[in-house]
């Protein structure tokens, strides 16, 4: 498509696309942690600031091409989606307007709670978070009440679930904004090894669009 629009060869379009993608990754940090995590003193300050709110977390899966060998097929097959998928998990502020941390390109069957436990050490030890039922059992995590077998939720539990849902809507909006990019709205057709780069580049563009990154500091 780039070749048709700009009248360049397929190989030139390929090189230009991947050059631009890598450039975006270099200048637009995908998350607060990627931007400031290397500075222990500054990140410690940011942790204390984030501690004043409840962070939101959510995961999303995107279909990918079917791997050729059977072992790889099994590793990437999501029973939930009934297809081979790539998973991304986002940790965001309570208003859904800043990405605190992002993990992208892991196999779809990877449990959301395991990804959160991987991210948790980067947060303040007392940081409170909120997620859906996939995160039940995680420390310092508020989740909806899960209906037990042959037992209905109480009225109080249903009301609490509504409150949690109302607060989690902001990270759902964030996910929708990321999926505005068409490359995330259907099967990922590039080499799956490029998915992490693509996803994190889009996270960087999202942060830049909302003014979270001072682009003027880069010498471009």
Residues of each region from the PLM?
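Short, well-ordered secondary-structure "scaffold" segments embedded in the functional core
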Residues: 1-25, 30-220
């Amino acid at each position: 498509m780039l070749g048709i629009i700009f009248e360049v060869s397929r190989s030139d379009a390929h090189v230009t696309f991947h050059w631009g993608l890598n450039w975006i990754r270099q200048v637009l940090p995908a998350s607060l942690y990627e931007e400031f995590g290397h500075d222990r003193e500054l990140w410690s300050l940011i942790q204390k600031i984030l501690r004043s709110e409840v962070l939101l977390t959510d995961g999303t899966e995107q279909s990918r091409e079917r791997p050729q060998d059977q072992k790889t097929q099994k590793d990437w097959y999501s029973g939930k989606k009934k297809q081979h998928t790539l998973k991304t998990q986002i940790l965001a502020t309570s208003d859904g307007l800043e990405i605190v941390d992002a993990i992208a390109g892991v196999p779809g069957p990877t449990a959301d709670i395991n990804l959160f436990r991987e991210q948790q050490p980067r947060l303040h030890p007392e940081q409170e978070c909120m997620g859906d039922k996939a995160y039940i059992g995680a420390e310092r995590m508020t989740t909806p009440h899960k209906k037990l077998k042959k037992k209905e939720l109480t009225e109080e539990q249903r009301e609490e679930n509504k409150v949690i849902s109302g607060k989690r809507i902001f990270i759902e909006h964030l996910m929708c904004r990321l999926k505005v990019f068409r490359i995330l709205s259907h099967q990922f057709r590039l080499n799956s090894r490029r998915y992490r780069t693509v996803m994190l580049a889009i996270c960087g563009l999202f942060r830049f669009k909302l003014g979270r990154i001072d682009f003027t500091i880069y010498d471009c």
